[in-house]
């Protein structure tokens, strides 16, 4: 006869889950280089606690509700991770003992799967595969001892462990996002040289577009920038149409996710927006339309085929944001430079338009024919770029 858990045991489990859900956690949001300040501002607007910015990541404190809210609503962060520990690790023994000391059982159940990923820079422990093995062994030994198991099945939900070792200091994280946050779930297919959704959202943010102005991307490609502009105008949370790694964790009450998603939907705006995406390639434009439909914003975007160097400006004033082709990708460098020269001449008298153009071309201003009002260095993946701002 199967044993029925006592009311006391059930109450203990419920109390444990509640305590973990309510405890204060330190979380890290990795981001593309150059976006740290923007991500910090996003978190502050969400009223996250103790936000602090470091190179390529932003930390904040909060509970599971704050974690879920960040996952659902962040536009420019790459993922949300719980910081489990930080300790010196200049030897494999130190790494093993540091990981084994982490109370992983607070999060990972007896059947939880816990793969390990990580990296090491400027450290004595430079072999990433060896470090992965040590972290995994320490986690197995810890959980096995806590659950009284000599073998862990790992047949349940995934609790992705991540580590970083920098200058002999190890940090261990629990990844709550699963798939990176830049994957919104709307990219049905992509064309050559796509722009990360998080970077596209950053360009829209830098342009200060909020839905009132006319918005135009003359090189719209697969539509990422105009789709992110529409999501911004609608104040629609980018994570509403995707799932997250922590969404089915036993330690996170389902009510938390339901609450933050309902909250996000209640914050959406309703209105008419003037957003235009143009591209010279009809096949690419078809991809953009498909992506916009999948994102649920196709009715807010006008897609048209056309040459950016010949199209008439749609109106006297507006916001132009674009990622034009440059030499590292689709065009030879000279062709890309000539394109910028022609495009710059075409926009010579467009003084009513604020322009935000991202490019890896070091001499962009020379070819465009005008000094930028302001420049900002960013990385599109590993490619160093500048955002040239004209206003």
List each model region and its residues.
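Methionine residue identity
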Residues: 1-3
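A short, flexible beta-alpha/helix-coil linker loop
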Residues: 121-124, 180, 325-329
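Short beta-strand/turn micro-motifs composed of small residues
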Residues: 31, 279, 359
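Non-catalytic nucleic-acid substrate-recognition regions in nucleic-acid-modifying enzymes
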Residues: 17-157
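Conserved S-adenosyl-L-methionine
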Residues: 195-312, 328-329, 335-337
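Intrinsically disordered, low-complexity segments enriched in serine/proline and basic residues
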Residues: 5-6, 12-14
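S-adenosyl-L-methionine
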Residues: 23-45, 52, 58-75, 129, ...
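C-terminal catalytic and target-recognition region of SAM-dependent MTase-like enzymes
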Residues: 308-310, 314-391
């Amino acid at each position: 006869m199967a044993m029925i858990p006592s009311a006391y045991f059930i109450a203990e489990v419920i109390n444990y889950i509640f305590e973990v859900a309510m405890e204060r956690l330190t979380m890290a949001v990795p981001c593309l280089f150059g976006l740290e300040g923007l991500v910090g501002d996003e978190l502050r607007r969400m009223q996250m606690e103790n936000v602090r910015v470091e190179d390529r990541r932003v930390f904040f404190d909060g509970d599971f509700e704050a974690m879920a809210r960040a996952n659902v609503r962040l536009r420019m962060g790459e993922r949300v991770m719980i910081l489990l520990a930080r300790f010196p690790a200049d030897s494999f023994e130190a790494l093993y003992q540091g990981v084994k000391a982490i109370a992983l059982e607070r999060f990972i159940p007896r059947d939880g799967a816990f793969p390990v990923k990580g990296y090491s820079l400027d450290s004595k422990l430079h072999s990433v595969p060896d470090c992965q093995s040590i972290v995994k062994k320490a986690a197995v030994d810890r959980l096995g001892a806590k659950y009284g198991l000599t073998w862990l099945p790992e047949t349940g939900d995934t609790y992705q462990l991540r580590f970083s070792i920098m200058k002999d200091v190890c940090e261990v994280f629990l990844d709550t996002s699963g798939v990176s946050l830049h994957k919104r779930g709307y990219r049905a297919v992509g064309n050559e040289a796509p722009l990360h959704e998080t970077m596209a959202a950053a360009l829209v943010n830098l342009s200060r577009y909020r839905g009132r102005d006319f918005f135009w991307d003359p090189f719209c490609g697969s539509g990422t920038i105009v789709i992110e502009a529409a999501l911004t105008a609608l104040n629609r949370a980018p994570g509403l149409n995707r799932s997250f790694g922590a969404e089915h964790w036993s330690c996170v009450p389902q009510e938390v996710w339901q609450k933050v998603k309902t909250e996000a939907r209640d914050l959406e705006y309703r209105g008419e927006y003037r957003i235009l995406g143009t591209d010279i390639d009809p096949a690419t434009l078809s991809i953009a339309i498909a992506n916009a439909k999948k994102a649920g914003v196709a009715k807010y975007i006008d897609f048209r085929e056309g040459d950016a160097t010949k199209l008439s400006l749609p109106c006297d004033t507006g916001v132009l944001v674009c990622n034009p082709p440059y030499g590292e990708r689709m065009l030879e460098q000279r062709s890309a430079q000539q394109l910028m020269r022609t495009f710059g001449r075409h926009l010579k008298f467009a003084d009513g338009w604020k322009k935000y153009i991202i490019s890896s071309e070091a001499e962009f201003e020379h070819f465009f024919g005008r000094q930028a009002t302001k420049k900002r260095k960013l990385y599109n993946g590993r490619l160093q770029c500048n955002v040239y701002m004209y206003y």
